[in-house]
C-alpha cells in the first residue's frame, strides 16, 4: 500500500536541523531550469553570543572613524533568542583604544583629542565580520532593517586589497521602501557601456524602489556571485545584475552604521530617530553549487543547529516598483522565479520553504532506492513540513519539479 504524507503548515514549532551536505539543499528556480546548491557556511545565531570561530565583532582594521568619532564596538553586538542584534547609539564616552588603532596621521588630520589612549566618541555602531573568506556562491541573509533617519544597515562582501566589494544590500531608515545595491573595484570597472552608445558609460548601482516598505519587516536579501556576474535578489525576486568579476576572495559582513551630515548616505540622524536602535538578523547562509571547487573540497557537514519554521517571522510579498534597465540587461533574467529550500529537522520532518513570487507550480517528490515514488506534493505554502516518520531509514531521492524541468538529490532519513 502506497504511503502518503500531508504537507503540514505549522505554528511556532521549534525544530533542530541536521544541515549536512545531503539533507539540506536549496534550488534556484527559473522558468526553464532548476539549479541545485549545497550548504557551505552558515550561522543561525542559536547561541548566547556571537560565534567567535566564525566572526569578528569588529572590523579587521579596528573600526574607529576619526572624522565622525564613530566606533564599531563589540559590546553593541549580541545574540539572543535565535537573533543576531547589531546595535547603534549616540554616546559621549571616552573610549580606550590599543596603540595599533590610534593612527597618528588620522589623529592629527582630524584634530582628535587623545587622553591616555582614550578618545571621546559621538557614535557607537556594530558589525559581524566573517573570519572566513569566500569566492563565488549564493549569499543569503534574512534580516529586519530599522526605520529612522540616518540608520544605515548593510549586508555585503569585502575583499580588502584591492578594495573589491559587493553590496547586496544597503538601506537608510528614512527610505522605507528603498534599497541600494552596488559594487566597488579598481580601474573604473563599475562603469558599464550603454547599449547603442559605445562611447557612453554609466556607473552601475543605485537605489531601487519597491511597492512595499522594507524597514521593520523581515526580508531575505541575497545574491549569487559566479564567474562573470553578480545577481541581486530581494525576497527571491531578481532586482539587478552586474556583469563583471572580482579577483579576490571576500569577507562576509552584516553591520549597522549611522550616516552623518555631509558624509556617505547622508542625511544623518534627527530628533525623531529612535536611539538606541538595532538591525536584527535571523540567519546568514552561504551555498555552493555542485561544480564549485570549494564545495568539492569541503567534504564535511554544515551544522544549522536550532531553527524554527519562520512562520513567526513571515516574509511579506515585495515587488520591484521601478526597474533600472541598465541593471537588468539580460532578457533571461525575466525567467528567474526564486528559491526553494529543504531542511531535515531532528524529529524526521522535512521543511520546505519558498522564496519567490511566481512558484505556484513547484512539486516535491520523494523516491525510494527502488525507483518508487512514495510521496508527491504540490507546494502551495511559503513554509511547510513533510512528515517522514512513516518511512524506513535509508537513502531517498528528493526531486523538485517545475513544469517540465526537474532536479534531484539524495537525502538520508
What are these regions (language model features)?
Residues 12-15, 310, 372-373, 405:
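Detector for intrinsically disordered, low-structure N-terminal pre-sequences
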Amino acid at each position: 500500500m502506497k504511503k502518503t504524507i500531508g504537507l503540514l503548515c505549522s505554528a511556532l514549532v521549534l525544530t533542530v536541523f541536521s544541515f549536512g551536505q545531503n539533507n539540506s539543499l536549496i534550488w534556484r528556480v527559473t522558468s526553464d531550469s532548476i539549479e541545485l546548491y549545497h550548504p557551505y557556511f552558515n550561522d543561525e545565531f542559536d547561541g548566547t553570543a556571537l560565534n567567535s570561530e566564525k566572526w569578528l565583532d569588529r572590523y579587521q582594521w579596528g573600526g574607529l572613524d576619526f572624522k565622525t568619532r564613530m566606533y564599531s564596538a563589540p559590546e553593541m553586538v549580541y545574540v539572543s533568542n535565535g537573533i543576531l542584534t547589531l546595535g547603534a547609539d549616540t554616546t559621549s564616552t571616552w573610549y580606550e583604544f590599543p596603540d595599533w588603532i590610534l593612527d597618528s596621521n588620522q589623529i592629527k588630520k582630524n584634530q582628535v583629542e587623545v587622553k591616555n589612549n582614550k578618545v571621546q566618541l559621538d557614535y557607537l555602531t556594530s558589525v559581524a565580520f566573517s573570519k572566513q573568506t569566500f569566492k563565488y556562491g549564493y549569499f543569503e541573509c534574512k534580516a529586519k532593517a530599522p526605520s529612522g533617519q540616518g540608520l544605515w544597515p548593510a549586508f555585503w562582501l569585502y575583499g580588502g586589497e584591492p578594495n573589491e566589494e559587493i553590496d547586496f544590500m544597503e538601506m537608510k531608515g528614512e527610505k522605507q521602501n528603498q534599497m541600494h545595491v552596488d559594487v566597488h573595484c579598481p580601474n573604473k570597472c563599475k562603469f558599464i557601456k550603454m547599449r547603442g552608445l559605445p562611447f557612453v558609460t554609466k556607473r552601475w548601482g543605485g537605489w531601487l524602489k519597491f511597492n512595499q516598505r522594507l524597514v521593520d519587516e523581515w526580508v531575505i536579501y541575497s545574491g549569487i556571485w559566479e564567474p562573470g556576474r553578480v545577481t541581486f535578489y530581494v525576497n527571491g525576486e531578481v532586482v539587478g545584475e552586474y556583469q563583471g568579476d572580482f579577483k579576490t576572495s571576500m569577507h562576509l559582513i552584516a553591520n549597522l552604521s549611522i550616516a552623518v551630515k555631509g558624509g556617505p548616505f547622508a542625511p544623518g540622524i534627527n530628533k525623531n530617530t529612535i536611539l538606541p536602535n538595532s538591525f536584527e538578523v535571523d540567519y546568514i547562509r552561504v551555498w555552493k553549487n555542485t561544480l564549485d571547487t570549494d564545495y568539492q573540497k569541503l567534504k564535511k557537514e554544515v551544522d544549522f543547529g536550532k531553527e524554527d519554521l519562520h512562520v513567526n517571522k513571515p516574509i511579506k510579498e515585495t515587488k520591484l516598483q521601478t526597474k533600472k534597465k541598465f541593471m537588468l540587461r539580460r532578457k533571461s533574467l525575466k525567467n528567474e522565479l526564486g528559491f526553494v529550500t529543504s531542511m531535515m529537522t531532528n524529529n524526521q520532518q522535512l521543511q520546505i520553504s519558498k522564496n519567490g513570487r511566481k512558484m505556484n507550480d513547484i512539486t516535491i517528490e520523494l523516491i525510494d532506492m527502488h525507483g518508487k515514488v512514495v510521496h508527491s506534493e504540490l507546494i502551495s505554502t511559503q513554509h511547510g513540513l513533510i512528515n517522514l516518520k512513516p518511512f524506513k531509514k535509508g537513502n531517498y531521492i528528493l526531486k523538485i519539479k517545475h513544469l517540465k524541468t526537474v532536479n534531484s538529490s539524495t537525502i538520508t532519513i
